[in-house]
């Protein structure tokens, strides 16, 4: 298998790999609350400027692309979620939360959940084990 690329793996190989990670029992309830036919989970990654910072590319163009989320998208998203009474989770890299504390306060004030999304959106698959700890 080591000589093959993932797209070249035979079906038993990828089925076995995926099977290792499968959760145990089904979490689907016998009936959803209020007669609903399904459940939906909505979350947002509020990465903002952390991707270009992580990539060591603090060019004004890349930073301004990251700022779009805070300046334009987030107010619209919060307004939509409030109008539709949709609770959600916003995942923030710590650096993004430190750069935009007023946004984090607004998210919390609207009753949404905050989740941590790394320090600066590290590419954790490339980190040495000791750095990841």
Regions found by a protein language model. Name each.
Residues 2-133:
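Catalytic alpha-helical scaffold of carbohydrate-active enzymes acting on polysaccharides/glycoconjugates
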């Amino acid at each position: 298998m080591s000589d093959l690329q993932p797209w070249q793996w035979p079906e038993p190989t990828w089925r076995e790999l995926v099977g290792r990670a499968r959760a145990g029992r089904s979490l689907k309830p016998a009936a959803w609350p209020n007669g609903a036919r399904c459940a939906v989970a909505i979350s947002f990654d509020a990465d903002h400027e952390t991707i270009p910072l992580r990539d060591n590319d603090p060019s004004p163009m890349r930073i301004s692309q990251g700022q779009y989320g805070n300046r334009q998208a987030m107010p619209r998203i919060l307004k939509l979620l409030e109008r539709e009474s949709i609770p959600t989770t916003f995942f923030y890299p710590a650096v993004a939360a430190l750069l935009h504390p007023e946004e984090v306060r607004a998210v919390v004030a609207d009753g949404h959940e905050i989740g941590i999304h790394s320090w600066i959106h590290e590419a954790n698959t490339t980190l040495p084990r000791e750095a990841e700890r």
